Amino acid sequence: MGKLLLWVGLVLVLKHHNGAAHKLVCYFANWAFSRPGPASILPRDLDPFLCTHLVFAFASMNDSQIVAKDARDESIFYPEFNQLKERNEKLKTLLSIGGWNFGTSRFTTMLSTFTNREKFIRSAIGLLRTHGFDGLDLFFLYPGLRGSPRRDRWNFLFLLEELLLAFRREAQLTMRPRLLLSAAVSADPHVIQKAYDVRLLGRLLDFINVLSYDLHGSWEKVTGHNSPLFSLSDDPKSSAYTMNYWRKLGAPPEKLLMGFPTYGRTFRLLKASKNELGAEAVGPASPGKYTKQAGFLAYYEVCSFVQRAKKRWIDHQYVPYAYRGKEWVGYDDDISFSYKAFFIKKEHFGGAMVWTLDLDDVRGTFCGTGPFPLVYMLNDLLLKAEVSSTLSPGFGLSTTVNSSRTCPESLAVTKDLTTDLGILPLGGEAVATETHGRSDNMTVTPGGGLVAPTRPTLSFGKLTVAPEGKTESPGEKAMTPVGHPSVTPGDMSVPPVPIQTGDRITPPRRQAVAPEKMTLPSGKRSD
């Protein structure tokens, strides 16, 4: 009862004032249609007024060019997805490329030379404009890891720099709004250290989607929550910790979007009588009826599970879990989403990212609380309300482990990080039907700077773009970017980019840092 009263007070505090400028970025998975029965979701089933930005996941890549994953995307799903903007003219749509199943090899090949990056950029502009997308989202998991060479960390930054310049130039020539540029990034400090130059990402991207979930799961030997808001004294993994880590490393807080999972992670308990947080587990619980993935339940499957289960609340992490027999699930609900929305507002972050819309109760048929109950709560609290200056009693923002003023400056320094970080796939993507030293163009300066003195001019001599507001049919070659005569910038070129002192892409000279007591999984998830 105390938790419920505190939650009601929190919602009232959040809704005390009207008007707020936050982003609510929501992914839609292009394999959602393949789920059975009422769980099958198409782009036309989405509510165009819930999110400020919708992101279509995922596109693919062929010969260093972005392409639709299959003909169905170009002929049916892209048009349906972008037609949502006809109902809400303020909505922005992005196309995401990558994902866990995509791997890293095609990214590495594309990033390896300026010529390949130029091909990718030209194809991206053509595909985005042809189908009416407003931007590109890069879901590269991860530069310099999972088989990606270390130089990809720097080549990825070169790509972002070149994309941004090309997007600006294309906007000038076509008199259209500039295409947006975003990226999905890890929540793991060890991955962050190896994969990203945080300050440069913050300068080059319009917003940064932090994957602050899958922090615990059935790959571990004890139960833990998928996406706790706050850390425990013996477990620093949490959404708050991750967001403050990115901010302390130099990312602009207004560009950081915290990840909100519309799914739970499950465990099979060793003993049914031992069912608390941290109880011994022996693997994943049974697959869900619709998602059919061991260790994973969509929110609409969680609703069915908890009807016959015992529910508990983790006081210091502000998230629920439930257990039934030997099955245990850590998940989010509207109450935990409310606390997380409160955290975003109090800490002045840019907003929320949802993975994914199609894992929420889209039609309201499973949970009995109306369509999109989780995302609707975020919409209501982030987009329609402004937080007051008074904290609700007992809300743990001031604890040492969660304070934005102590993390991560107090982290221990490690001299070496193992290559096997136990990196894990993001929620639900395993059900996707995917089929799929030193760089030769760089010079290391005496001061440690990394520059590319011979980077050629980025040219778009044959780029063709569809008329504004028009979605073209895919034509015969649906797996390749489509160009249609309309605007042909024959002299569309971007001059070489001088890398200024203080802004150049520079390898770090400091030792890597890692959080104290951070325990990483020993290996990848078995499912």
Swiss-Prot record:
Location of region: Disordered: 433-527
Record's keyword annotation contains Disulfide bond: yes
Signal sequence bounds: 1-21
Annotated Gene Ontology cellular component terms: extracellular region; transport vesicle
Main subcellular location: cytoplasm
Pfam families, per the entry: Glyco_hydro_18 (PF00704)
UniProt xrefs under InterPro entries: Chitinase_II/V-like_cat, Chitinase_insertion_sf, Glyco_hydro18_cat, Glycoside_hydrolase_SF, Glycosyl_Hydrlase_18
Top-level division of the source organism's lineage: Eukaryota
Record-listed chitin binding positions: 71-72, 98-101, 142, 211-214, 355
Subcellular location: Cytoplasmic vesicle, Secretory vesicle
Known glycosylation sites: 62, 402, 441
Gene Ontology BP, a term: chitin catabolic process
Sample GO molecular function, one term: chitin binding
Tissue expression: Oviduct.
Role description: Binds to oocyte zona pellucida in vivo. May play a role in the fertilization process and/or early embryonic development.
Family designation: Belongs to the glycosyl hydrolase 18 family.
Name recorded for this polypeptide: Oviduct-specific glycoprotein
The organism of origin for this protein: Sus scrofa (Pig)
